[in-house]
Amino acid sequence: MPSIDLKDQYFGCEIEMTGLTRQQAAEAVASLFGTNAVHSRSSRTYDPWEVTDNEGKTWRFVYDSSIHGSHRTGRQQVPIGDGDYKVEMNSPKLEYSEMGKLQEVVRTLRHAGAVVNGSCGMHVHVDASKHTPQSLKNALSIMYSKEDILFKALNVNESRVERWCQKVREPMLEKIRKLPSNTTMDRL
């Protein structure tokens, strides 16, 4: 059975931040790409700002109520109740070759004033379309075996582990491992 090469894997990121508004974040990234930031009225809840990159992919900056907003006053971050400072960036579907683009977007946001605090987090969505049931079983087993090391290295706040970034549960892992080898992706 062929393995999945990391370089063939599609992914997307959600990165939470504060220190700047959704509009400021979108305008900074639009400047990087030489395009425009657009205030989309598609959702009153998430109040999205959108930027299209040079490949026609859309980067979104949306409201996230879990973020504790702040803004810079001099050299200090000061808490602020203004929801505009609660920013979650949603990347488009990216290829491995676009990792540099993602890094440049993050650097651009940092230079524009983006910061993180204990309420901010990130996660990565991994495209499963090229996976097989066996490769997903393998990925889950690897993640389970390395979770504690990753969480410690990343200094993940325990309250976030409880609520937002829960670890793989052993009963679920065992259930997946016991699936027959002829299990289809639809069955998974």
Label every PLM stretch briefly:
Residues 1-188:
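Phosphate/nucleotide-binding catalytic core
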